[in-house]
């Protein structure tokens, strides 16, 4: 899935890649701060472990984005000197991992609301750590196998049965994760805003809902474009290439937006000066706001 097509070196290629680099640099700083604070400055709990790994996935995805776009711009200036390597497989690992983290966050939060007694009493202590480790391993395995059999969007082996099976399995995984994300998020919304036993809105709910919403608006188009190009065989002409560039910019915006969401939710309605640690801590707060509310982490089980 190379970003270049014959004769495509023009302002339409230059501007999107500059946007990717700019938003990517902002996102790298934001996700690095989130990773540092959650990894070394704050006590970890069930949901902060997922947020930490999501920040790592966003950081790696943006890093690949920046390298890819920078090399493309250098090739734009010196087409005969610099070879543009393919980062598609590497980029898909954090993309799949990020989607998996979001699905896991939303699903676990849904379970804590729908089955609160089971969640508090029967949930294994290290569930978040085990889940995140499994997500990284499976994401890497899926991408390596897909690249081994045919490569992402590589039409060279498109009629090979192993390639078709690998692409089908990868697409099925993405669709499954998307369905899980949507259903669990919908269940959370129903419990928050509908029925007599609706839950009170907390900052943790707001953080999760905004993160999922931004992914659906900005991160999902990249996966949809990949799916259409693989299975429906859309013509990779000017129109499809423009959509592809737009999807790439949106994915960079998605990974860049997550730290902004955390700090926005954590600082909302608090005018006084606070450290980034306190703001991020408040964004993961799982208790309803009160006039005398103090900063506290989620009441979920703490994980080492």
Curated annotation (Swiss-Prot):
Q: How does it sit in the membrane?
A: Multi-pass membrane protein
GO MF annotation, one: G protein-coupled receptor activity
Supply the alphabetized keyword list: Cell membrane, G-protein coupled receptor, Membrane, Receptor, Transducer, Transmembrane, Transmembrane helix
Task: Give the UniProt subcellular location, in the record's own words.
Answer: Cell membrane
Q: Which Pfam families match?
A: 7tm_1 (PF00001)
| Database matches in CDD domains | 7tmA_MrgprA (cd15105)
> Which organs or tissues contain this protein?
Expressed in a subset of IB4-positive small diameter nociceptive dorsal root neurons.
Q: Which residue ranges does UniProt annotate as crossing the membrane?
A: 18-38, 47-67, 81-101, 133-153, 168-188, 212-232, 245-265
Instruction: Tell me if Nucleus is a UniProt keyword of this record.
Output: no
Give the record's GO CC terms.
plasma membrane
Cite a single GO BP annotation: G protein-coupled receptor signaling pathway
Outline what the protein does: Orphan receptor activated by a subset of RFamide-family neuropeptides such as FLRF-amide and FMRF-amide. Mediates its action by association with G proteins that activate a phosphatidylinositol-calcium second messenger system. Its effect is mediated by G(q) and G(11) proteins. May regulate the function of nociceptive neurons by modulation of pain perception.
Q: Which family does it belong to?
A: Belongs to the G-protein coupled receptor 1 family. Mas subfamily.
Q: What is this protein called?
A: Mas-related G-protein coupled receptor member A
